[in-house]
UniProtKB/Swiss-Prot annotation:
Disulfide bonds: none annotated. GO terms for biological process: alanine biosynthetic process; pantothenate biosynthetic process. This is Aspartate 1-decarboxylase. The lineage of its organism: Bacteria, Pseudomonadati, Campylobacterota, Epsilonproteobacteria, Campylobacterales. InterPro entries: Asp_de-COase-like_dom_sf, Asp_decarbox. The modification Pyruvic acid (Ser) is found at residue 25. The gene is panD.
Length: 121
């Protein structure tokens, strides 16, 4: 049996832009992507702390060091610039893998600078 478990998350990132005319996705600073072990094209869930919205999209690489968090396309209507969001990725694990299970949690400040990286829920 496979279990859907947290793979990684970027916790309380600040939305820096919302681009309605782009073809969908979330643009994430490359450094934040690497810290959270996210891949280009990977499906993620977006949880908006300010308005309660929850939706899925996929990741595209943003400029390294820009601290960009930009919702694109239709998702741009679900957030406002300045909103705090949680970007969550899941993976499937076999029960045997769960004994060493350690998700990656990236904590950021209001400027999307990395404050801490933890490997626990």
């Amino acid at each position: 049996m496979k279990f859907d478990m947290l793979w990684s998350k970027i916790h309380r990132a600040t939305v820096t832009d919302a681009n309605l005319n782009y073809v969908g996705s979330i643009t994430i600073d490359e450094e934040l992507m690497e810290a959270a072990e996210l891949l280009v094209g990977q499906k993620v869930e977006i949880l908006d702390v300010n308005n309660g919205e929850r939706f899925s999209t996929y990741v595209i690489r943003g400029e390294r060091g820009s601290r960009e968090i930009c919702l694109n396309g239709a998702a741009a209507r679900k957030v406002a610039i300045g909103d705090k969001i949680i970007i969550v990725a899941y993976a499937q694990y076999d029960r045997s893998e769960l004994s060493s299970y350690k998700p990656t949690v990236v904590l950021v400040d209001e400027k999307n600078d990395i404050v801490q990286i933890k490997h626990e829920v």
